Structure formats: structure tokens, C-alpha cells
Amino acid sequence: RLRLLNAGPSRFYEFYLVNSANVVQPFTYIANDGNLLPAPLLNQTRVRLGVAERGDIVVDFSRFALNTELYLVNRLTQTSTRGPGAVQAPGTRVMKIVVNRNPPVADVSRVPTALRAIRRPTAAEIAAAPVRRWVFSRRNGFWSINDKLINVNSAAARIELGGAEIWDLDNPSGGWAHPVHIH
């Protein structure tokens, strides 16, 4: 299991796992910012991460011969802080993995078919849910939400445990690509 985290302030990445000939190798995608997915996504070839996003992947290294070299590469171009550009191969190598079997015992672990149950709201709950609008803007080099700068000591919203709301996130700030993380 590899946890990939984009800890940068403005860069997007699109990661691929490739061998030394730049042939893409599949993996299983099991988690993102919201923790475990309901079920694993099998045979994935890429994971895109925005600012402060994470993705957990599982690679079955038993498929590879001892001393095989694999690389995590970024193929997403980005030349400005406003957002990503095109996907271009072969990409930039970010991490090298050399397959080793130490200790030399068989790994019998398996990714389960169900990772976690997620209770989905009913149509009636969605229809009755209150709507909050969050407008993101950027001025004088700072981001604001609903015309307010962030206050880390105050929650902007409080929702009853088990409650549901619809949040409308609007970023009319002229081409800035920026993921939103709700904590």
C-alpha cells in the first residue's frame, strides 16, 4: 500500500506506475481524501492529485521479478499556479521502486471486495436538505470564502451529527484551479 500525498501549495499531479521501459503498470485504488472507498477500483493506471489531496494505491509486487525497477512518474504538466496543463508521456520520475522480497515469505494479503459501507441519503433526505452556498474569491493574493478570510479558530458551519446538507461550491475567480477540502 502506497499513500500518495500532494503536499505542495499549488501544483497538480497525475501519477502513473511504469516499468523501466515506461510501460504503465496497473494498481488498485483504495482510498482518497474521504478515506477508504466503498470498494477497490481495480486495474487503475493513474491517480490525479490536487493540492493537499491524497490517494492510496495497492501494488501487487509479486507480479514482478526480483530486482525489477518501477517508477512513479508524473505526466501532468503545469507551468503556472492557476492550474494544470496537458498530460504528456513519458513524464517525470518522482520515485524509484526496486522489487525485493525480504523477508522471503509469501505475502498472502488481499484487498477485500468491500472496503467500507457508506450510507447514502434517500431522495427524500436530499430534497429536504438545506443548501449552503460557498463563494470562493481571490483578491490581493488571498483566498476568501463568502468574502471572509479563513479563521482557523472558528467553524464556518456546524451540522448536526448524522445530518445532511447540500453545499454549492462556486469559484468564479477567473481560471484558478484549486481543490476544496471540507474538514
Residue spans of the language-model regions?
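Beta-strand cores of secreted/periplasmic/IMS beta-sandwich domains, seen most often
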Residues: 1-19, 53-76, 119-138, 152-182
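Active-site-adjacent structural elements in folded domains
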Residues: 39-43, 148-155
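Eukaryotic Cys/His-coordinated zinc-binding finger proteins
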Residues: 142, 146-147
